[in-house]
Amino acid sequence: MNTIALVTGAAGGLGQAVTHKLAQAGWQVVVVGRDGARLQQAFGGAHRQIVADCSTTAGVKALFATLKAEQLVPTALAHCIGNIRLGAAHRMAEKDFNNCLTANLVSAFHTLAGFTGQLRDAGSPGAAVFVSSAAARIGTPNHEAVAAAKAGLEGLVRGAAATYASAGIRVNAVAPGMMETPATAGMISSPTTREAATRQYPLPGIGDAAELAELMVWLLSPHGARVTGQVWSLDGGFSTIRPLVR
């Protein structure tokens, strides 16, 4: 059985957690990022490290050309690229909105295209998992840009799952609420903001990358063999329930 996994955005907090969980589970991991120095800092000499920009077709083509040249055919993809661009629509610059779409949706589309193309050429089944957000499912103030991008991502997941099911390729996503990672550090840097963030959730608290990574690795594993086209929430009930007001 081929147990090569590809992790994009690997130098980030979630990417590192997913890489660690995959390696623990016995996968050979290929880690990808735009900054080679950050990859080196995160992983030292561990794992095959490839510098590529997955937000462009050229970057994705270069990535999969490198994999092909090295006879590496990943059968699992954990796409951990994204950003959190907050702000009301009328205040957001066009550049910031475009960056949000590129990081959260465009990169996912191009990477999925490269991944599924290589699997189909190899005649191999596989699985991909992407990262959405609770904001795609419930209106949250100042989340217009990221909500639009992640809602598009969820549509991509369902469409691709339908397209590639007959080839044995599964496509899913996870949708966390607030997680404690370097990307969110500024939002919960004070006791006041941390307490406010914690109290939003029916199950109070802030998630961490290791929790989400555990679910992502499960979805990529044989245990998730009957799961495709799904978006799994890990948000303390934020997007689905309302507790009693006491």
Q: Can you describe what each PLM-predicted range is?
A:
Residues 173, 192-227, 234-236:
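C-terminal helical subdomain
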Residues 11-12:
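Conserved glycine-rich cofactor-binding loop
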Residues 117, 162-166, 225:
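Alpha-helical segment proximal to the catalytic Tyr-Lys
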Residues 112, 149, 157:
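Active-site helix of classical SDR
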Residues 133:
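Residue(s) in the substrate-gating loop at a strand-loop-helix junction
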